[in-house]
């Protein structure tokens, strides 16, 4: 081996080169110098096809001479850069080392991070978030929707603020009948409503097939109200009698399937109470409320009232009628009528309940009806028999209105 003097350039013969560990530290014999050079280009996995190794007369680069000239015979430029990375950039110190430095695998590309300009991130930033909770009261057939607050809403007015309110819509269903809304809060992008809206007449079947659409809108006195964002919750995600809390990013407006909406549209529902009173010797029929009634007027509402008949009615004296509730599709009546009749005769009777829309100067419009009695089926039959079997006990049930009543005169 030729020793280097001060100021002279080190020279190593090829024989010595093939028998020396070029890494700093004690000189150790090795099998072949190529063990310390990557056999694949930077960035490719080890299974990639190896590049052609450098010719045996290519001079090796020691850590002390990483900045020295490279041999023109070494055509694998990428391999040389990898060597610089492995032996130079990783800082091999000139001190003694217990052994040869291991070959570091090529750095893995960083994992994809969420795109700050992506759809979800953009909606959360531009449209805002909404906090609310839902509770299905199975015993009372009610869905309670508590709208808590919103944060970071999109500015809609010239002053950089908005006048937000929240609108609820049960899908599928008649538009006006299934919509509820909160109060409007003025000049804020972070409104706090803490308001509970309730849908009545919700059945287990509704919880399986319906979806709650929650929209945040900006109220405008001089123009149409503007849409800010929405979210949708399939009701089948809720457990009966358990409150579920949500904090959701608002999304852009989604289309409503009008065909499906129309095919599943109902005439409405009615909550009826039945009780046979031993004291009054009669049947007490309570008209509690209606929900999701069909709109019969041009303004998208109805002016509903309810009529009841106990048939057969030879003397035609069994007709009772509630008061008219103006401009509503979810009227609350809380009226009760008494039919004097022996308990044993009820098995031969049929209770007919019909809902009407009151119109001034023309015929009233039939909205829907329901018949309870021995010839009824399903829940209507069960409700009637439960009343007969449980004297002096008030039994309330929701019933779906139909647009046809067998044997009924559908005119008022």
Swiss-Prot record:
Residues 38-123 are annotated as: Disordered. Changing residue 360 to A: Loss of calcium-dependent binding to liposomes and altered fusion-promoting activity. It is found in: Cytoplasm; Cytoplasmic granule; Cell membrane. Ca(2+) 1 binds at residues 157, 163, 218, 220. One of its GO terms (biological process) is positive regulation of calcium ion-dependent exocytosis. Residues 112-123 have a biased composition (Acidic residues). It holds the Pfam family C2. Gene3D superfamilies: C2 domain. Residues 257-375 are annotated as: Mediates interaction with STXBP3. Changing residue 218 to N: Binds liposomes in a calcium-independent manner. It is a peripheral membrane protein. Ca(2+) 3 binds at residues 297, 357, 359, 365. Its main location: cytoplasm. The modification Phosphoserine is found at residue 411. Ca(2+) 2 binds at residues 297, 303, 357, 359. Keywords: Calcium, Calcium/phospholipid-binding, Cell membrane, Cytoplasm, Membrane, Metal-binding, Phosphoprotein, Repeat. Residues 95-108 have a biased composition (Pro residues). Residues 49-73 have a biased composition (Low complexity). InterPro entries: C2_dom, C2_domain_sf, Doc2, Rabphilin/DOC2/Noc2, Rabphilin_Doc2_C2A, Synaptotagmin. GO terms for cellular component: cytoplasm; extrinsic component of synaptic vesicle membrane; glutamatergic synapse; plasma membrane; synapse. It comes from the Eukaryota. Its cofactor is Ca(2+). Interacts with STX4; the interaction is calcium-dependent, increased by insulin and glucose, and mediates vesicle fusion with plasma membrane in pancreatic cells and adipocytes. Interacts with STXBP3; the interaction is direct, occurs at the cell membrane and regulates glucose-stimulated insulin secretion. Interacts with cytoplasmic dynein light chain DYNLT1. Interacts with the SNARE (soluble N-ethylmaleimide-sensitive factor attached protein receptor) complex composed of SNAP25, STX1A and VAMP2; the interaction is calcium-dependent and competitive with SYT1. C2 domain 1 is involved in binding calcium and phospholipids. C2 domain 2 may also play a role in the calcium-dependent targeting to membranes. This is Double C2-like domain-containing protein beta. It comes from Rattus norvegicus. The gene is Doc2b.
């Amino acid at each position: 081996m030729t020793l280097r003097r001060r100021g002279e350039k080190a020279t190593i013969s090829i024989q010595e080169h093939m028998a020396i560990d070029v890494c700093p530290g004690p000189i150790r014999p090795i099998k072949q110098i190529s063990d310390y050079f990557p056999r694949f280009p930077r960035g490719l996995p080890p299974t990639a096809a190896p590049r052609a190794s450098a010719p045996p007369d290519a001079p090796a680069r020691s850590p002390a001479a990483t900045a020295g000239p490279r041999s023109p015979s070494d055509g694998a430029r990428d391999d040389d850069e990898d060597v610089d990375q492995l032996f130079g950039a990783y800082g091999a110190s000139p001190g003694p080392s217990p052994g040869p430095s291991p070959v570091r695998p090529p750095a893995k590309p960083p994992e994809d991070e969420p795109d700050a300009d992506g759809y979800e991130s953009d909606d959360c930033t531009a449209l805002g978030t909404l906090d609310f909770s839902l509770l299905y009261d199975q015993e009372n057939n009610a869905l309670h929707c508590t709208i808590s607050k919103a944060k970071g809403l999109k500015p809609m007015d010239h002053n950089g603020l908005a006048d937000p309110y929240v609108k609820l819509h049960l899908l599928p269903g008649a538009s006006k009948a299934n919509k509820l809304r909160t109060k409007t809060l003025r000049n804020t992008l972070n409104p706090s409503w803490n308001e509970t809206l309730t849908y009545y007449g919700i059945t287990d079947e509704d919880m399986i097939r319906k979806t709650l659409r929650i929209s945040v809108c900006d109220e405008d006195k001089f123009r149409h109200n503007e849409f800010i964002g929405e979210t949708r919750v399939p009701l089948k995600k809720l457990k009966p009698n358990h409150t579920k809390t949500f904090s959701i990013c608002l999304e852009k407006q989604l289309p409503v399937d009008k065909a499906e909406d129309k095919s599943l549209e109902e005439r409405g529902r009615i909550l009826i109470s039945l009780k046979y009173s031993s004291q009054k010797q009669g049947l007490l029929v309570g008209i509690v409320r209606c929900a999701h009634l069909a709109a019969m007027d041009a303004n998208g509402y109805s002016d509903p009232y309810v009529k009841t008949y106990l048939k057969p009615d030879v003397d035609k004296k069994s007709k009772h009628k509630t008061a008219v509730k103006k401009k509503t599709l979810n009227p609350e009546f809380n009226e009760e009528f008494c039919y004097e009749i022996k308990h044993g005769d009820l098995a031969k009777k049929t209770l007919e309940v019909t809902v009407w829309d009151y119109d001034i100067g023309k015929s009233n419009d039939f909205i829907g009806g329901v018949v309870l009695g021995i010839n009824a089926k399903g829940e209507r039959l069960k409700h009637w028999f439960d009343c007969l079997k449980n004297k002096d006990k008030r039994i309330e049930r929701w019933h779906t209105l139909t647009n046809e009543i067998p044997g009924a005169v559908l005119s008022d």
